[in-house]
Regions:
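A conserved FAD-binding loop/helix module that cradles the flavin
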Residues: 1-57, 140-157
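Flexible, glycine-rich terminal cap/loop adjacent to redox cofactors
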Residues: 45-52, 60-157
């Protein structure tokens, strides 16, 4: 979905979506597979690592004008007990400011946030669009400035 080009992304989630399309069509339907953005998440040694869309290296190889932004923030309100670091990297096209991909590393809230980026990729959002997202706020679970919003604000500078 990001590049419009075919890609090999061997994930169970992709296989399930394609299976659903195949099953519906086998029963006489007209379903189409819309594509994927390649969202992946793993937990390793207490950290959650997630990616979606293109990496900076992939974007460069496809001749995008790559704009990389990396920030460190807190996964919940910084003054709330248990707040931990979370790192967000956004990859955007410098010519159009369209989001091309992102990676997130932290202890919690990573999968939810990479899903926000995947939704942004699916809808071809720009960095400015990300800045305008209305994300949740509650000190024990979500800071007033979500790390995605912080990264988008830094990327817009």
């Amino acid at each position: 979905l990001v590049t419009g080009r075919p890609d090999y992304i061997p994930l169970g989630s992709t296989a399930n979506k394609q299976g659903r399309v195949a099953g519906e069509n086998a029963a006489g339907g007209q379903a189409m597979f819309g594509g994927v953005v390649g969202s992946m998440v793993v937990r390793c040694f207490g950290l959650v690592v997630a990616t979606t869309g293109l990496t900076a290296a992939q974007a460069r190889a496809l001749d995008y004008d790559v704009q990389e932004t990396t920030i460190q923030a807190q996964d919940i309100a910084h003054y709330f007990p248990g707040a931990a670091d979370i790192h967000v990297k956004l990859i955007a096209d410098g010519k159009t400011n369209r989001l091309l991909g992102g990676q997130i590393v932290g202890q919690r809230g990573v999968a939810k946030r990479v899903d926000v980026l995947a939704t942004a990729l699916h809808n071809r959002l720009t960095i400015a669009d990300l800045q305008g997202l209305d994300l949740t706020y509650a000190p024990p679970v979500a800071p007033v400035w979500d790390p995605i919003l912080i990264a988008a604000n830094v990327a817009a500078r």
